[in-house]
Every structure is written in structure tokens, then in C-alpha cells.
Amino acid sequence: MSYKITVHNREQNEKTHTYEADMCEMACLRKKRTGLPVNIYVDDSGVWKQSGHANRIKIQNNRGEHPVTTDMIPMSIGEAPDILIKNPKMELSQSDINAVKKFIIANKDLLNRLGEDMDIDDFIKAMVVIR
């Protein structure tokens, strides 16, 4: 899905710029709900099917409590989850990444059903929490 976004830098009083950007709405699953050391983002609308790539989650690249959607790390969903970008600037430990992989493996079928026959509320009720 493509949206037009208008950007205006008020500090420098620059002209307004309009550009198109691909935006995919993803639901934030906070770490207190999942048991993970980081917040993660899941596609609960099935937009990934229209985008030309496989389903994935995005990992917040810090351990903060507050959701941060900049500098996210995409990870595949499957039996052997993998980071989908080369050499990311990583602020997370290998232990953090391993916990996310464990969550994906435990919930891969549910993650793939999101946006098809399962909504985010049903997912949250059924998901395996990592402790």
C-alpha cells in the first residue's frame, strides 16, 4: 500500500516536500506481553502477501519499554528464523536474538495465520509466551 506523506521542516523553514512511501501497518507486541527482552512487530493484516516478500516480524533494535519503530530488524518466520538484512547495526545481544528466534519457532503457525483466519486478539490469547 502506498501513501503520500507530506514533510515540513519548521526549524529551517524549508519548503514542504511530498513523497510516496510504502507503509505496512504492524501490530506492536510489547515485551511484557511476550516475555521477550524486546518489543516486536507483527503483520496482522496480511499486507506481506501484496508486498512481494515472505511473512516476517520486525524486532525493535533496543530493549526500551516504549515502542520505537525506527531502525527495526526484520526476521523471517519459520523453523530456522534468520535476520533478513546483512550486517545490521545491532544494539541487541545474541541472547536477545535467540529469545526472539525461540518465540518465532514456538508461534510460527500462529504468526502465519495472522491476517488470514486469526486476528491479533486471538493471536495474543493463543501465543506461547517466552519466559
Give the residues covered by each predicted segment.
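Short, compact, well-ordered microdomains
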Residues: 89-131
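Generic detector of leucine side chains in alpha-helical contexts
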Residues: 23, 29, 36, 84, ...
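Short, charged/polar N-terminal "headpieces" of proteins
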Residues: 1-57
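A short, structured beta-strand/loop element
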Residues: 36-98
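Detector for methionine-enriched segments
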Residues: 1, 23-26, 72-75, 90, ...
